[in-house]
Regions:
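Glycine- and acidic-residue-biased ligand/ion/polar-headgroup-sensing regions
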Residues: 38, 47-60, 64-65
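A cytosolic small-molecule/anion-sensing beta-strand core signal
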Residues: 27, 55-56, 71-72, 90
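Ligand-binding loop in jelly-roll beta-barrel domains
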Residues: 80-99
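A generic "binding-loop/recognition-motif" signal
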Residues: 29, 37, 66, 82, ...
């Protein structure tokens, strides 16, 4: 099991934007890495809360009809059951924290 993760290197190896790769589990929680591109991503909601940590770049969200921008170093927590979508223009690397 890996214990040290070079997130920039791992993100560069991701073949497809918005297709996350699970790096590890901590209890019931998954840590997943995703590469963002400028394309929008469809609306979704989850049974559990989801953390979106922007490692570099910007994430542009629509959360229940409200525009939210998350920049590098910021963590946005999407509450369980809340509808959210990625707006066009997002870019960079995202760490997704979910159950």
């Amino acid at each position: 099991m890996d214990r040290l993760f070079d997130l920039a290197q791992r993100a560069a190896q991701l073949e497809q934007a918005w297709r996350s790769k699970r790096l590890a589990r901590v209890g019931d929680t998954s840590l997943k890495l995703a590469r963002m591109d400028a394309q929008a991503y469809p609306d979704e909601a989850h049974a559990c809360a989801e953390g979106l940590l922007v490692l570099d770049g910007e994430l542009h969200l629509d959360v229940a009809g409200v525009a939210v921008t998350v920049t590098a170093g910021q963590l946005y927590m999407v509450p369980a059951g809340v509808s959210h979508a990625v707006r066009p223009g997002s870019h960079g690397t995202l760490l997704v924290i979910d159950a």
